[in-house]
Amino acid sequence: MNENLFASFAAPSMMGLPIVVLIVMFPSILFPTPSRLINNRLISIQQWLIQLTSKQMLAIHNQKGRTWALMLMSLILFIGSTNLLGLLPHSFTPTTQLSMNLGMAIPLWAGTVITGFRYKTKASLAHFLPQGTPLPLIPMLVVIETISLFIQPMALAVRLTANITAGHLLIHLIGGATLALINISATTAFITFIILILLTILEFAVALIQAYVFTLLVSLYLHDNT
């Protein structure tokens, strides 16, 4: 049966209940706003994780680089929350779109490069020509270093897109195989279902790891330019 032309724009539902309500409510449940500073163990764990992550990322930075602390923490929380929300049934993961990831990577990368040229002009220009380069290789190395500099935001975006997309495709394929094997072999279907559960747990870890890797690389680019 052919689907309606506007079926892709319809609000997803499961068992007659709209998934949109759960998706909208999930961030407030995950990060509740307590009436006092430390309300329960969940808030304590959240604050401990944020403090631990910020210390690891900002340990290599000087005073100027640490002014980006709020930006980096907001970035890792945004990407991590988006990746986790994308694992909900019938939901969409924005970080599987290269356009969105480039929209995050390019401004952040450009900000670090502009910061470097503004405050460390000579050091930033020195990156294009490693010390001790033979004279005949200077033009070629300048071109190579320039290309590698402009590839950095593309590498950030493609890495995040590829990892999240690959995980979702595997979940979709193994889930479809599980449903197809139910009527053929219950034992094989059960084994496939166990694999699906393990893969889903792995994807939760990947969702958080990719958020950390993306933010860590931005932090390293910032360190090179401050």
Curated annotation (Swiss-Prot):
An individual GO BP term: proton motive force-driven ATP synthesis
Matches recorded under CDD domains: ATP-synt_Fo_a_6
Main subcellular localisation: mitochondrion
Domain of life: Eukaryota
Alphabetized InterPro entries for the sequence: ATP_synth_F0_asu (IPR000568), ATP_synth_F0_asu_AS (IPR023011), ATP_synth_F0_asu_bact/mt (IPR045083), F0_ATP_A_sf (IPR035908)
Topology with respect to the bilayer: Multi-pass membrane protein
SUPFAM superfamilies linked to this entry: F1F0 ATP synthase subunit A
Catalytic activity field: H(+)(in) = H(+)(out)
GO cellular component, one term: proton-transporting ATP synthase complex
Matches recorded under PANTHER family: ATP SYNTHASE SUBUNIT A (PTHR11410:SF0)
Family: Belongs to the ATPase A chain family.
Summary of the function given for this chain in its UniProt record: Subunit a, of the mitochondrial membrane ATP synthase complex (F(1)F(0) ATP synthase or Complex V) that produces ATP from ADP in the presence of a proton gradient across the membrane which is generated by electron transport complexes of the respiratory chain. ATP synthase complex consist of a soluble F(1) head domain - the catalytic core - and a membrane F(1) domain - the membrane proton channel. These two domains are linked by a central stalk rotating inside the F(1) region and a stationary peripheral stalk.
Full protein name: ATP synthase F(0) complex subunit a
Species assigned in the record: Canis lupus (Gray wolf)
Gene: MT-ATP6
